[in-house]
Amino acid sequence: MAPNLRKSHPLLKMVNNSLIDLPTPSNISSWWNFGSLLGICLMTQILTGLLLAMHYTADTTLAFSSVAHTCRNVQYGWLIRNLHANGASFFFICIYFHIGRGFYYGSYLYKETWNTGVILLLTLMATAFVGYVLPWGQMSFWGATVITNLFSAIPYIGQTLVEWAWGGFSVDNPTLTRFFALHFLLPFLIAGLTLIHLTFLHESGSNNPLGIVSNCDKIPFHPYFTLKDILGFTLMFLPLTTLALFSPNLLGDPENFTPANPLVTPPHIKPEWYFLFAYAILRSIPNKLGGVLALAASVLILFLIPFLHKAKQRTMTFRPISQLLFWILVANLLILTWVGSQPVEHPFIIIGQLASITYFTILLVLFPIIGALENKMLNY
């Protein structure tokens, strides 16, 4: 009998083991769809980004005009740009749901997979930040100035580091050029890290909503989950295209329709919505270095999650107190996101400070305590 090429060919064999014959738990829910959605987001962003890069000029005098030219004169340039800009929002929606799923169902106990995932998040955040600077509007310029300036809070080397990053004494042409280079490069790094992420995942196999070993009940990935993923793609592309076609600027900042002007500061400098929670934590601390450390900690705390797991059960499926705490954390993050979009004045300052304290308390203190408490409750 002739060998099956799908199973014998060195390259096809890898694809087969990852996407076709992969043994998958039969009970994984739609929360497990977000991984593949992130993959399709990445592919869409790389494709639209490549098409945009063909018409973009990384020069302070031409960047704004080149983006306007793309939207006005390039065939479907407006659509490509709108899909790329709003695609970033959907990328973050998916990654936040994906992290939330991992947190709720204890997927972080696959430490290597979790850690590569956190590195992926950090790389994605860096990519989105440098990408936001490229249209060279007011919010692009001032966002770049404010965020890069945070590095100057690092003792001794801070100022040197910032000027080195800028390529001068302020955000200018060298900054824009290197940000474009980074924005082009980083998505391919993300693609590489994704393969590492999947390699680690396939070492152990997928977790499932019950958090129990599922080796006795696995089904092939294709056709069951390929079909389920295609449904997921459809359900994601529908709101993405709706947003890109009907209200493409809904999530953007009107300030970015004004070309960058170093002499005029916008009344409210704020990042895109997906960074607002971290921005609110940064602003809630009056000290510059303290704010920067809190900002870094707000994301880096994810590396600690596997070590803070004290419960005997892996998932929160049968842990009602942890569930309650989880949804309080979600609400808290939404409050932080809202506060981050508001001006720095009473009552938003105190709300932001309380929400920031709550965020760290829930993750560092309450989750381990409640996990241990639920272990005690299992004995009664």
Swiss-Prot record:
Record text on cofactor binding: Binds 2 heme b groups non-covalently.
List of residues binding heme b b562: 84, 183
Location of the protein in the cell: Mitochondrion inner membrane
Transmembrane feature ranges: 34-54, 78-99, 114-134, 179-199, 227-247, 289-309, 321-341, 348-368
Any one GO molecular function term: ubiquinol-cytochrome-c reductase activity
Residues that, per the record, bind a ubiquinone: 202
Keyword presence, Transmembrane helix: yes
Gene Ontology biological process terms, A to Z: mitochondrial electron transport, ubiquinol to cytochrome c
Membrane topology: Multi-pass membrane protein
Cited InterPro entries: Cyt_b/b6_C, Cyt_b/b6_C_sf, Cyt_b/b6_N, Cytb/b6-like_sf, Cytochrome_b, Cytochrome_b_C_euk/bac, Cytochrome_b_N_euk/bac, Di-haem_cyt_TM
Pfam families: Cytochrom_B_C (PF00032), Cytochrome_B (PF00033)
Keyword annotations: Electron transport, Heme, Iron, Membrane, Metal-binding, Mitochondrion, Mitochondrion inner membrane, Respiratory chain, Transmembrane, Transmembrane helix, Transport, Ubiquinone
Single GO cellular component term: respiratory chain complex III
Highest taxon of the lineage: Eukaryota
Cofactor entry: heme b
Keyword DNA-binding: no
Oligomer status and interactors: The cytochrome bc1 complex contains 11 subunits: 3 respiratory subunits (MT-CYB, CYC1 and UQCRFS1), 2 core proteins (UQCRC1 and UQCRC2) and 6 low-molecular weight proteins (UQCRH/QCR6, UQCRB/QCR7, UQCRQ/QCR8, UQCR10/QCR9, UQCR11/QCR10 and a cleavage product of UQCRFS1). This cytochrome bc1 complex then forms a dimer.
Record's function text: Component of the ubiquinol-cytochrome c reductase complex (complex III or cytochrome b-c1 complex) that is part of the mitochondrial respiratory chain. The b-c1 complex mediates electron transfer from ubiquinol to cytochrome c. Contributes to the generation of a proton gradient across the mitochondrial membrane that is then used for ATP synthesis.
General remark: Heme 1 (or BL or b562) is low-potential and absorbs at about 562 nm, and heme 2 (or BH or b566) is high-potential and absorbs at about 566 nm.
Similarity comment text for this entry: Belongs to the cytochrome b family.
This protein's name: Cytochrome b
Lineage: Eukaryota, Metazoa, Chordata, Craniata, Vertebrata
Gene that produces this protein: MT-CYB
